[in-house]
Swiss-Prot record:
This is Uncharacterized transcriptional regulatory protein C139.03. It comes from Schizosaccharomyces pombe (strain 972 / ATCC 24843). GO terms for biological process: DNA-templated transcription; positive regulation of pyrimidine-containing compound salvage; regulation of transcription by RNA polymerase II. Its main location: nucleus. One of its GO terms (cellular component) is nucleus. Residues 93-119 are annotated as: Disordered. The keyword Iron-sulfur does not apply. GO terms for molecular function: DNA-binding transcription activator activity, RNA polymerase II-specific; RNA polymerase II cis-regulatory region sequence-specific DNA binding; zinc ion binding. Keywords: Cytoplasm, Cytoskeleton, DNA-binding, Metal-binding, Nucleus, Transcription, Transcription regulation, Zinc. Residues 23-51 bind DNA. SMART domains: Fungal_trans, GAL4. It is found in: Nucleus; Cytoplasm, Cytoskeleton, Spindle. It comes from the Eukaryota.
Amino acid sequence: MSETTKSGSKKSGQTSRRAIHSCLACRRKKLKCDHGRPCSNCLKRSTIQSCIYIDPGKTNYDKRFERGSEADELIDQLLSRVSMLEKRLNEVGTKSQSDYENQQSHNLPSTPSADAETQRNIGSLSVLDDTKSQYANYSSSSHVLWHLRNYHYLNLDQDIQEENDSLISPFFFRISPNESAYDYLPPKKVSDILIEQFFFRCHMLINVLHRPTFYVRYNDFWEKPHLRKPAFTSLLYAIYASALLATPVEVQKTWALGEDERYLQVDYHQAFRYALASSNFLFEPDLNALQALVLCQVVFDSDRIRAPPSLVGLILHVALCMGLHRDGSLYGLNPVISEIRRRVWANIVLSDLRTSETIGYPPQIVEGNYDTRLPSALPDEIHNVDSSVIISEATFVNIITKVSRAYSKCLKVLLGIIAPNYTRLLELDRELSNFFKELIEVNIPTSNTMHERHIRLLVSYLSNRFPILLHFPFLLKKNSAQFAYSHSRALESATLALNQLYELGSNPEYSKYSWYLWRYPPFHPCIVLLLDLLNSQKIIYLDDERVVLLNKIFSLFPRSSGKEHYQKAWALLQTSRAKVWEKLGLSTVDVSTTDVRLTNFEFFDANNLDINWDDWDAIFQHCPF
């Protein structure tokens, strides 16, 4: 009786109330929805604007959906409105998109569209603004919490009380209560000069910025001081410090700043650290702060043995948390922000590769774990600045990214737990040689401009350095069957690399970029020549081609650097050369880099190292470059 009463109390035609989890588009087409934001079905049909979810927590929606016919009518109305909006957006966006595609450089390769790869594990990207984002993959706890918080309206943070003081306190550096990061800020006149020098000397080699976007924020920084943010301030200080390091002192004197010249002596690297700490970077990652950290890591911290692994590891994990390993176009980010993220990621991949080469463990960034596209030039950059310069900058970062990806595969095999056999090493050597040959022919077919000649020469220099690393372990095994070929191959590559390095450093045409070369000394090529001289059965004279070449390289170094930030490798190289010259009975009077000059330049004192200078294996262990 009770059962009959209960069933009879229901209104005829009334269905049980059920939460609607599928998007409206999938529900209408009766498709299985994966509840993504957007779902895979809407991604596949390129109708992500139609991927609408109804809030299950609001009763007025539930009451409407108790009656099926009204629900269908509501869905039809919503979808018709969305379709109309999509049509208008497509009409407006088609022309601008075609303009972007038509103005892309013909030198840059086309990349596949995001729509063609909709089967990827997309995950979720929360974008707070152009500089702050957070990535979470499916099945991760972060994604589950993100989903509950954003789509089920559960305020999971309401019971978590955080003390602001603990978050604001600097993690990296302690700032005096009487000091502020803004105390280091130069006048705008000086700032403008340093910004100009940065784009002239550094931007092509460390391309992490988009000029038009940067200048918009830069002008706001000076015109609206009340809106200044520590993250962007840290980026400015990183740019100032990089520009001063890359600009010769004699050029700085021509600026005629008068009393403002004192701002050229400010430690902007330290100011960058203060601003980075003030930005609360670890707890609130920001793209501007990440750009600043990448800049300073390349320009300043590459001269340290232990700093790169920890700093690059920090940079890498912050970038992963921000989702830079996923291409922004997959999440509907605008082309400019997506391109900035690609450039930053490209430099992080390169830093990871350099750290791997320095320390000797496999690269942490492995192909297949990221889908960020190759960087390229944007039309607004080409329009506002000399197009040849922009194309060259985009070509360089594009090529270096390709080189990093190819070389990363090689280092993964070379530095793995199981050492590859000699046959595999020879295969890697051939693969890299063919890769570089094709890369130059396809991407830099001509040498008509200074930038094209410079990029061709720089890529050729890199291509001749890589085989040395492959054959280096066999150079100390004189009695092995592999010694003869490895010695010949390494010697050939070292000679070519050093000759190309000398041209890069001595040709006035490339002088504005020479500072970058000395951040990564040619340790391996120089040691290969020194070993060859020691193993020679003939009497060596000062006019020997190998001796002349080594002296030429060292003659460039003091003239090209002129800063306090030197690397341990240069001191080891100088001392190694002096010991070899002494052993061969060669005069060191004409050697450009003497011990006296080293002291003036504040080099690391390699003479105090407890090293047997006849034990080359020990030298390698002390300097991994």
